[in-house]
């Protein structure tokens, strides 16, 4: 049965997608991160409505990570603290069993890839495809159809690009 929370959660995903597209038109990294933070807030709100708490926690940690980047705070300790926070809070607030771990694993592996392979575009893109693929499954499970469709399209596009650029 479609409830008001499902409708509003999906509308939030649509608004967040629009905000994500606006972020790409920003002229500065600070502008991109600020608009992406707004997007993460909207995604997080929608994910909360859809009762995907471990995913909402990942959105909140992403906002904190962007804030640290906007303030240009360079600290490996802080970066790893944010990774640890995402894992611990994601596990703690997981209410969906194995499915609830998908956003935690997705963000964890993607963050590690960025730390370890930041100069290897292909490795980061492979990790991104895995991340978005995991979020596709999670979004289906929480009935976030808008998010699942957009994640699926991005995953397929990324995989096709990776295959073509072998």
Residue ranges and their predicted role:
Residues 1-166:
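Alpha-helical membrane-protein topology signature
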